[in-house]
């Protein structure tokens, strides 16, 4: 095949994909990247952060990006990496937890909520972790009292806690402030999965915050050891650009393995070969948008979220919980059936595990007309 024939055939495959701007993707936490990312991607497409000595400029960019993201999370001196996504970030945190607890002679008992991302199921399987699942409150957050009592009764057998800041299904935020206190009092590691919420919560206008809800989640809390945060979600970076940040570089020695044939003799990330595109794109987009740009982005998405909730209620649909961020769960006892009917109309939503509900993520690519069209189709599925 010649080059043009190859490109034409590839274009036919690409045309089978959904496009974010069409508005039919309502269940994804990713969105159309910022347009500048295309130019940056071309500039950095051959870089490999797995061998940083060969790509010194890109490696410097990664350190700068980690510091920039750390600044959002109240710790410019954080240590970490931009990696493939939230799954690798959570696996990395759990690997550090396991190795630290082993060094202290403690069992690998980790408290992880039912609302946690399925990447923690992978961590449990790969690392043979012992997972404790606390009950949930009516707000779909971990029961802090249960955790306190469990740790007290277990006589120092718990080595780590995972809290969620923007759970995948509902957007709920665990009481990280209280979990932080527990972690400090009991010398326990605390990882926060803010893969989605990390680029939402810091920019959320107070008018969208729920009364009595604690939105604190980052390194300003002394007990927080590590945070997952993904620029390729609400950060507008291209896939793949996930982030794992640790409070300081003390954690590095629990991640390093020898890599004698590379320009640096140790490597800490799970994936060895890492493109620099995610790093460079994140750097550029964060520099371009700044705090003001992200505040506008998040609060426009929240405005559309409130519109969706209001219109859904006019159609007779109710939410499982009031939206904590730009994620909406609409109650539906026949969620799987409804999901498939909507797919027949080309609407791609997802379903919640922890409650009978459809899950809609109001990402920046969604417009009001898309929301109106979706709700009309959803209403029509209930007429038959």
UniProtKB/Swiss-Prot annotation:
Cofactors required: pyridoxal 5'-phosphate
Encoded by which gene? mfnA
> What Pfam families does the record point to?
Pyridoxal_deC
Would the keyword Amino-acid biosynthesis be found if you checked this record's keyword annotation?
no
**Keyword Lyase applies:** yes
Its EC number is 4.1.1.11, 4.1.1.25
Check the record and name the InterPro entries matching this protein. GrpII_AminoAcid_Decarb, MfnA, PyrdxlP-dep_de-COase, PyrdxlP-dep_Trfase, PyrdxlP-dep_Trfase_major, PyrdxlP-dep_Trfase_small, Pyridoxal-P_BS
Q: Which PROSITE patterns does the protein's record reference?
A: DDC_GAD_HDC_YDC
Originating organism? Methanococcus maripaludis (strain DSM 14266 / JCM 13030 / NBRC 101832 / S2 / LL)
Any GO molecular function: aspartate 1-decarboxylase activity
Carrying N6-(pyridoxal phosphate)lysine, the residues are 233
Q: Which reaction does it catalyse?
A: L-tyrosine + H(+) = tyramine + CO2; L-aspartate + H(+) = beta-alanine + CO2
Q: What does this protein do?
A: Catalyzes the decarboxylation of L-tyrosine to produce tyramine for methanofuran biosynthesis. Can also catalyze the decarboxylation of L-aspartate to produce beta-alanine for coenzyme A (CoA) biosynthesis.
Task: Kindly state which keywords UniProt assigns to this record, in alphabetical order.
Answer: Decarboxylase, Lyase, Pyridoxal phosphate
Family per record: Belongs to the group II decarboxylase family. MfnA subfamily.
List GO BP terms, alphabetically. carboxylic acid metabolic process; coenzyme A biosynthetic process; methanofuran biosynthetic process
Which Gene3D superfamilies does UniProt cross-reference here? Aspartate Aminotransferase, domain 1, Type I PLP-dependent aspartate aminotransferase-like (Major domain)
Give the pathway listed in the UniProt entry for this protein: Cofactor biosynthesis; methanofuran biosynthesis; Cofactor biosynthesis; coenzyme A biosynthesis
Q: What is this protein called?
A: Probable L-tyrosine/L-aspartate decarboxylase
